[in-house]
Amino acid sequence: MSTKAIYPGTFDPITNGHIDIVTRAASMFDKVVLAIAASPSKKPMFSLDERIALAEQATAHLVNVEVIGFSDLMANFARAQQANILIRGLRAVADFEYEMQLAHMNRHLMPTLESVFLMPCKEWSFISSSLVKEVARHQGDVSHFLPANVHQALLNKLK
């Protein structure tokens, strides 16, 4: 039986922390869908199409990872993808309460949907897309935290 997992997020933009999580998930499951949420209410810096393209480039070396955009409820998307596993990253204890609420709601909506929590390696445990964008807006060097293609796209966006 093959296992298919979904790693959802806004990925605005995708960071090395996200790449760390999806790489480890790809070694655990037969197929991983990197599901990029449209999230218009978050007013993303990058369009959905841009985020998909950046993520596809950054994960091209992972043969069992597919990047797909979505705008539906996660449980509905998981059902449509015939996936029963959600991958979520936990950076700190502060993330846990919110992630637990999401996991319970997703399980209520789709009882067979299990959430699997992965912690990023220590090097990436403090970064978020929001923090990276904020530092970059103030001319801070964020190249260490992003795949090269994403770093260049961020610099271009901020010109």
UniProtKB/Swiss-Prot annotation:
Q: Which CDD domains match?
A: PPAT
UniProt GO molecular function: ATP binding; pantetheine-phosphate adenylyltransferase activity
Give the UniProt subcellular location, in the record's own words: Cytoplasm
- What would be one Gene Ontology cellular-component term for the protein? cytoplasm
Per its UniProt entry, which superkingdom is the organism in?
Answer: Bacteria
List the residues marked with site Transition state stabilizer: H18
BP-aspect Gene Ontology terms: coenzyme A biosynthetic process
State the reactions this protein catalyses: (R)-4'-phosphopantetheine + ATP + H(+) = 3'-dephospho-CoA + diphosphate
- Per its UniProt record, what InterPro entries does this chain match? Cyt_trans-like, PPAT, Rossmann-like_a/b/a_fold
Hey, which pathway is this one from?
Cofactor biosynthesis; coenzyme A biosynthesis; CoA from (R)-pantothenate: step 4/5
Tell me the enzyme class.
transferase
Annotated ATP binding sites: T10, F11, H18, G89, L90, R91, E99, W124, S125, F126, I127, S128, S129, S130
Keywords annotated in UniProt: ATP-binding, Coenzyme A biosynthesis, Cytoplasm, Magnesium, Nucleotide-binding, Nucleotidyltransferase, Transferase
UniProt-listed Enzyme Commission number(s): 2.7.7.3
Q: Which residues bind substrate?
A: T10, K42, M74, R88
Task: Give the cofactors, semicolon-separated.
Answer: Mg(2+)
Function field: Reversibly transfers an adenylyl group from ATP to 4'-phosphopantetheine, yielding dephospho-CoA (dPCoA) and pyrophosphate.
Quaternary structure and partners: Homohexamer.
Give the NCBIfam families listed for this entry. Answer: coaD_prev_kdtB, cyt_tran_rel
The entry sums up its family as follows: Belongs to the bacterial CoaD family.
State the HAMAP family in the record.
PPAT_bact (MF_00151)
- Specify the protein name: Phosphopantetheine adenylyltransferase
- This chain is encoded by the gene named coaD
